[in-house]
């Protein structure tokens, strides 16, 4: 069986790289070494390096572990919290249900 590869949009790659860079900067601002950060997050230094480069092959769970170990987990809750477009689409799709009365033969 051939190995499936996922094709990523350029925007996706750009977002992951920026996210990884933001995590790296957060670590450096706290004067935390990569070895200590990896230990706190429960991941290997190689995985942390991949995260800080924005690798799409690293699991979301590992990214979250780094966020938690940096005290930034609340930022994750902001993702898609205010889905303005989704709410507009939902509101546009809402319709008033009308009851259908059944005709009974009496």
Which positions does each model-derived feature cover?
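Short, charged recognition helix plus adjacent turn
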Residues: 77-106
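A short, Lys/Arg-rich alpha-helix, primarily the initiator
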Residues: 5-29, 79
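Helix-turn-helix DNA-binding elements, focusing on the entry/boundary residues of the two helices
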Residues: 23, 34, 45, 60-63
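Short alpha-helical DNA-recognition segment
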Residues: 31-49
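Short, basic-rich loop-to-helix N-cap that marks the start of a DNA-contacting helix
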Residues: 55-68
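The alpha-helix within a helix-turn-helix
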Residues: 27, 38, 67
């Amino acid at each position: 069986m051939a190995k499936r590869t996922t094709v990523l949009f350029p925007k996706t790659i750009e977002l992951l790289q920026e996210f990884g860079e933001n995590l790296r900067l957060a670590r450096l601002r706290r004067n935390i070494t990569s070895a200590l950060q990896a230990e706190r997050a429960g991941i290997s230094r190689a995985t942390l390096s991949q995260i800080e480069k924005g690798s799409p092959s690293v699991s979301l769970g590992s990214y979250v572990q780094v966020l938690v170990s940096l005290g930034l987990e609340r930022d994750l809750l902001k993702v898609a919290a205010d889905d303005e477009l989704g709410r507009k689409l939902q509101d546009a799709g809402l319709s008033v249900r009308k009851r259908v009365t059944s005709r009974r033969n009496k």
